[in-house]
Amino acid sequence: TRVQDAYCLRCMPQVHGAVRGALEHVAGVLETEAGSATDNPLVFPGVDAAVISGGNFHGAPLSYAFDYAAIAVTDLAGITERRIDRLLNPDINEGLPAFLAMDPGLSSGFMIAQIVAAALINECQVLAHPSSTGSIPTDGGKEDHVSMGMTGAIKLRQIVEHVERVLGI
């Protein structure tokens, strides 16, 4: 006798809400960075003209945001796959045909859909490893702490494509 539903069912609003909150935070970072001055040096013309070298170009805010989004949407895919499994798995789907097959045993039904979801999520989990922590000095050491934000953005794009497929399943 089932006393409680699995976390993937009971905690869906909390996890989906946390993912939404993470993505809203990321959107805020992207908006802030899109409106910021990132040139180096910054040139301030006028009576009190000034040329200031600084670090506003550093990609840490974007890199952290890409990593955060990657982790959040990967987890969204993970909890989604758990619900796919609960629907298809004859051991836990409360009497539905195995893999929702018309003729269980002779037909594999939607079994491959769950396998595809699991494979996509596994790749997302690998890709969700933060890029921002992987700084490697460049430019003869002058750029000794780089954000690796482009790597994070490229990985995030691939993760989002995989997550879209999982959600489609």
Regions found by a protein language model. Give the residues of each.
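Accessory "access/gating" subregions that flank catalytic or transport cores
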Residues: T1-G78, E94
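C-terminal catalytic subdomain
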Residues: H58-I169
